[in-house]
Amino acid sequence: MLTIFIVTATLFAILYLYFTRNFNYWKDRNVVGPEPTVFFGNIMESVIRRKHLIMIYKDIYEAFPKEKVVGIYRMTTPCLLLRDLDVIKHVMIKDFDLFNDRGVEFSEEGLGLNIFHADGDRWRVLRQCFTPLFTSGKLKNMLNLMSDRGDKFIKMVEKICDKEPEQQIIPLVRKFTMASITTCAFGMELDEEMIETLDKLDSLIFTTSYGNEIDMMYPGILKKLNSSLFSKMIAPFFDNLTKTIIEQRGGKPTNRKDLMDLILELRQKKAIEPMKKTHDEQVTTLELTDSVIAAQTFIFYAAGYETSASTMSFLLFELAENPDIQEKVIAEVDETLKRHNGEITYDTLSEMTYLTQVFHETLRKYPVADILLRNAKADYAVPGTNVTLKKGQTVVVSGFGIHYDPKYYPDPEKFDPERFSPENVRNRHPCAYIPFGAGQRKCLGMRFGQWQVQVCIIKLLSKFRFEPSTKTMSEF
């Protein structure tokens, strides 16, 4: 019995020492931060799914208002949370070459080939390849597709609201974003079977797995094991969908000018390679295989569906809670559409400046890119501090923390579109507003996402006014 006790106690002692072995890392370097918990570090409430990680980082950001950087532990791994905007600008923009990896790469095949999760040379190639697809000139062709989906969406909403005017917004706008994304990406008309399939996939895509925590504790292990963060059902669906669409188009672009057309135009150029930085630099090339294309269409769908729907829901919630702002937006929508004969074009959107301010204020309060991560590619002396990051260490930026900092946004809980007047934007630090990220790894599809939200809001406000119901939550 005594032997069993000693063995058990020894085992627990070894485990305790192992899972706390790094917890003096920041203290030894005179970097302040919250006390870690055994095994979980500073993210225990996220691991047990009691609190979202974005709120944990926001709380840490707010707990150390005088610090430029804060030492934290993602599970047992020491990381640095950046608070100072100038430091963030150095990491995200000025010294980007040392921080161009997100550190979330999980596989070198299948869905892991997507531009969001890719790092290193693969990311550079993908970025150079796909950035031209998301310019205003290319995306203008998709506005007609969005507008057409919007018209069909409004007819559906009218039928629903004729029966019951009180509706939950998020399920409604998800119907629009699903239809918009699938037509703009794949040229698809949704039927009931496809809608049901996508609904099931959405729950799988947006269900958090514990793979993230494992990779936090053992950085890079998912890539080494070639293990996916996503359900095994997701990759075959996008692989089959991509192959089917490419076959239907004979492997060549059509005149639809949707995302698949633009990608097929790229594929006709064969292998893509990035520009060399130096004459002797090795160059990675990328062949646009069906698998590579499927990975990009997956991330385009995943990034554009739920984020746009959430943004629309929050925007409409704020308009319902602030009827004076809603009336101002409606007046601008009506006047602008009248000038453009009811058509939504690039010029139409450009002239709706107040709606654009409302959009940006919505993303300030409810940012899409809640957490920004970057990995140091070499030892790095953090500007304005005595802290040195070691190669491979991760920095964390809390978009929520910054967007709710009264130093940058007085009375941050208030919804105030005037924060994004041209004058206020000019006078604000460039890293004080980062809903889509910052620097060269900023979301490529942000313009598409903005237009998608604006088109839907314009269509809705042309027909409806929004009011809080008795079931509306006053806080999120």
UniProtKB/Swiss-Prot annotation:
Inducing factors: By furnocoumarin.
Membrane topology according to the record: Peripheral membrane protein
Top EC class of this enzyme: oxidoreductase
Subcellular location, record wording: Endoplasmic reticulum membrane; Microsome membrane
Documented EC number(s): 1.14.14.1
This protein's GO CC annotations: endoplasmic reticulum membrane
UniProt gene name: CYP6B5
Native species: Papilio glaucus
Name of the molecule in the record: Cytochrome P450 6B5
Assigned keywords, A-Z: Endoplasmic reticulum, Heme, Iron, Membrane, Metal-binding, Microsome, Monooxygenase, Oxidoreductase
Pfam families: p450 (PF00067)
Catalytic activity entry: an organic molecule + reduced [NADPH--hemoprotein reductase] + O2 = an alcohol + oxidized [NADPH--hemoprotein reductase] + H2O + H(+)
Binding site for heme: C443
Statement: the UniProt record of this protein carries the keyword Transmembrane helix: no
MF terms in GO: heme binding; iron ion binding; oxidoreductase activity, acting on paired donors, with incorporation or reduction of molecular oxygen, reduced flavin or flavoprotein as one donor, and incorporation of one atom of oxygen
Function: Enables the insect to feed on furanocoumarin-producing plants and evolved as an adaptation for detoxification of xanthotoxin and other furanocoumarins.
PROSITE patterns in UniProt: CYTOCHROME_P450
